[in-house]
Amino acid sequence: MVGQLQGGQAAGQQQQQQQATQQQQHSKQQQQQQQQQQQQLQLKQHQQQQQDILYQQHNEAIAIARGLQAATPADIGDNQPYYDTSGNVDWERAMGAGGAGAYGGIGIGSLPAAGGAAYHLGPANPAGLVSRHLDYGDGGHLAGPSAGLPAGAVGSGAGAGAGAGASVTGSGSGAGTGTGTGAGSGSGSGAAGKEVRYAPFPVASPTHSIPTTSQQIVGSVGGVGVGGASSQSISGGVPTHSQSNTTGALQRTHSRSMSSIPPPEPFMIAQSKAVNSRVSINVGGVRHEVLWRTLERLPHTRLGRLRECTTHEAIVELCDDYSLADNEYFFDRHPKSFSSILNFYRTGKLHIVDEMCVLAFSDDLEYWGVDELYLESCCQHKYHQRKENVHEEMRKEAESLRQRDEEEFGEGKFSEYQKYLWELLEKPNTSFAARVIAVISILFIVLSTIALTLNTLPQLQHIDNGTPQDNPQLAMVEAVCITWFTLEYILRFSASPDKWKFFKGGLNIIDLLAILPYFVSLFLLETNKNATDQFQDVRRVVQVFRIMRILRVLKLARHSTGLQSLGFTLRNSYKELGLLMLFLAMGVLIFSSLAYFAEKDEKDTKFVSIPEAFWWAGITMTTVGYGDICPTTALGKVIGTVCCICGVLVVALPIPIIVNNFAEFYKNQMRREKALKRREALDRAKREGSIVSFHHINLKDAFAKSMDLIDVIVDTGKQTNVVHPKGKRQSTPNIGRQTLDVQSAPGHNLSQTDGNSTEGESTSGRNPATTGTGCYKNYDHVANLRNSNLHNRRGSSSEQDAVPPYSFDNPNARQTSMMAMESYRREQQALLQQQQQQQQQMLQMQQIQQKAPNGNGGATGGGVANNLAMVAASSAATAVATATNASNASNTAPGSEGAEGGGDGDGGGVDDDNLSQAKGLPIQMMITPGEVAELRRQVALENLQNQRMDNLEQDVPVEFECCFCTTKGLPGCHGECIPLRANSV
């Protein structure tokens, strides 16, 4: 037993020793791996530093060495510096008055040559070329950089170099000598393939974007020796040049918005407007030139807003096409009214164009953003009167179309037949068959009227027992006509959509009166044929109905607009007709009495009484004058003359009103018929595919007005902290650049806006929007230069001289990006979950405080503060650093109690008020450059899906740039600012 125990103990000890040995070996392996990783990291850092130095030396050496060949005849002597897209001097194209010789003046520690305005590389460097970074350098590198003598030493040297380029386009080699201060010699080899982008004007607002090659440098660069102040020579290997087929930034200035050429960069647009004091406005092919400052007089108009646009997207929202090379903006509009509108910018006086339709002129005023209230007094009355008349005509036309559209026949096969029959009998213009039926109906009306007239001729009458009777043949013709009228009336009544409306219609009543006397007469004659005593009375009644047959001629009013207008005039001019009858009655009474007393004493006078004189007075006042009765005395003739003159005046007074009513109704009827014909023609053309309907004459403007997305304004006027509303301001860190403090608490306006919010206006009542972390419009145009060595070479632009933010109502606001509604919906769900988590955290905190003993208050308070900091960090990404600092402060606070560490803001924690203020903020999301295309696609899809045309009053486009905080791996580069399209509210 003892041996077994000893053996077991020995085995256990051996196993423990093996485990300890394995642990030691494992720890050694981990240490070795860590050392290897550190060595690799140091090696990478060293290689990166060496590569950066080589990049800098390589770029400057290439710039100086190929300056002579890069110069073009147009560049030499233009006395204008050239810049790359980062806002730095492009040393390859920096021409001066001295031409290419100016490059000779650039040396180590030397001054520029006397012949030109070349750029100084900087202070003296005792070891070689001054190290400068061009910010976009991405070419090859030199295996052995040139080395020079200390500055100030006098000597001479020679440089030679040779090498083969890694680029497929070619290689280069060269040698040269130079004399002067700081001459150097050296050799090296390596590949050089560098993208160069340049613009023909200074850059005040550098904007990084996706590179586009306009000129490639290939080949190797050998040793480089830099000449001194004598400007005689530059030695070194000169690389070969090859032009690329891709489009560069210089060519982009010639691009137009509708072409396939990439749009120009925002800084190009801004500098084009800064360089040119005039601008060409092309409206419908007619060019106008105007000063930019003239357009600034009306900043809220379309041309005034065009002056402030600095991005391609903002410009194409306002115009249809443009060319920076020609300094021309094109508007696809009618040019007739633009001269008057442009004169309004110049003189401040707006006049209408008489040759134009008033509605077309009004549409042009609305398009250019000019209010019609600016019209001069000489044109105000004429403009509004003409516009009111046109609107009244359009209203009546729309009313006619509305009445036509109100005819409802229901659904189903029977309704289709009913509608077809109604249009066939009631609307002759709808089809050829309807016109044929209308012609047949007119022929029957005329035939019936002729038969009625011929029946009165004695030669055609039939004598029965000494009593004249109707001709049997003409009676048969009349019977056929009455049968047609009866059938037509029954079919029209059965097909009408509204029976009661049809029955009380004026024309339908005439149709009924045209056929009813025939059947009444026929019925009376047949029923009283044997009653001899009553037959004579029946014949008198029949004669009355026979007289009513003449009303058949009024059936022509259904097919004649003039007859309908006459009936409308008589119906709507009853007041004027009554006034006319009153005037005539008074005149007849007065002049008949005077004529009676003047003529009663004459022998064989016809004025035997006043009623007998009414006839004479009536025909005299109406200027008819039959002559059957006339005065014979001198006084009677004077009375007759005065009666005639008064009759002319009395009759002429109400006649113009009656005539106007007739003309108005006739014009309305003709307009209604034309409107129906035009609408039917358009419907027929649409069915046949001859035309395509559209909603707005300017499709681009319609698309701009249909955009309804979300944008965010960060007002820099009020600097209030998100989590510390008491005034403890803390900035939010960002990747590679310093961001703004996000506003909250009282007065913050980090919320949805329509682009018209004024400064300090709170729009928190609307739905909050989403923005990317650090995605804002930063107008600090010297941000890149502060971290660049070239900052010492050129003067930096101040923030006051930079391009101002684009906002009409709030110029101090900085516009940031927008997101789609789907992102907002997801954020609302996330906010709801966060609020629930906050409530749970608060409940847990209360439970912990109740259960925790008094002695452990400090530790408990620190834990609660940590929880609260986590909640605050999940509520708003911009408050991450603040909440973390608060939690650290509460953890390190000695002797703090649980209540103080958990809820008191003095200890660095987050209180309930801060939480309630923080949870209303939106979630900040990070946007990477790879998501730009997807973001633009979502924005375009939402624009097409919304297609809102109801918000036409707001027409102010909102511009912004979204700065995506990424890195290119090169020093001095802090991301890309890519312009996106915003809503045109």
UniProtKB/Swiss-Prot annotation:
Residues 1-10, 171-191, 898-908 have a biased composition (Gly residues). The modification Phosphoserine is found at residues 690, 731, 796. GO terms for biological process: action potential; chemical synaptic transmission; larval locomotory behavior; positive regulation of circadian sleep/wake cycle, sleep; potassium ion transmembrane transport; potassium ion transport; protein homooligomerization; regulation of heart contraction. GO terms for molecular function: delayed rectifier potassium channel activity; potassium channel regulator activity; voltage-gated potassium channel activity. It comes from the Eukaryota. The keyword Transmembrane helix applies. Pfam families: BTB_2 (PF02214), Ion_trans (PF00520). It is found in: Membrane. Glycans are attached at residues 245, 429, 530, 749, 756, 885, 888, 914. Residues 240-260, 730-742, 749-773, 789-800 have a biased composition (Polar residues). The chain crosses the membrane at residues 436-454, 474-495, 506-527, 536-561, 577-598, 638-659. InterPro entries: BTB/POZ_dom, Ion_trans_dom, K_chnl_volt-dep_Kv, K_chnl_volt-dep_Kv5/Kv9, SKP1/BTB/POZ_sf, T1-type_BTB, VG_K_chnl, Volt_channel_dom_sf. GO terms for cellular component: membrane; plasma membrane; synapse; voltage-gated potassium channel complex. Changing residue 435 to Q: In allele Shab-1; temperature-sensitive paralytic. A motif (Selectivity filter) lies at residues 623-628. Keywords: Glycoprotein, Ion channel, Ion transport, Membrane, Phosphoprotein, Potassium, Potassium channel, Potassium transport, Transmembrane, Transmembrane helix, Transport, Voltage-gated channel. Belongs to the potassium channel family. B (Shab) (TC 1.A.1.2) subfamily. Shab sub-subfamily. The segment S4 is probably the voltage-sensor and is characterized by a series of positively charged amino acids at every third position. The N-terminus may be important in determining the rate of inactivation of the channel while the tail may play a role in modulation of channel activity and/or targeting of the channel to specific subcellular compartments. Mediates the voltage-dependent potassium ion permeability of excitable membranes. Assuming opened or closed conformations in response to the voltage difference across the membrane, the protein forms a potassium-selective channel through which potassium ions may pass in accordance with their electrochemical gradient. This is Potassium voltage-gated channel protein Shab. It comes from Drosophila melanogaster.
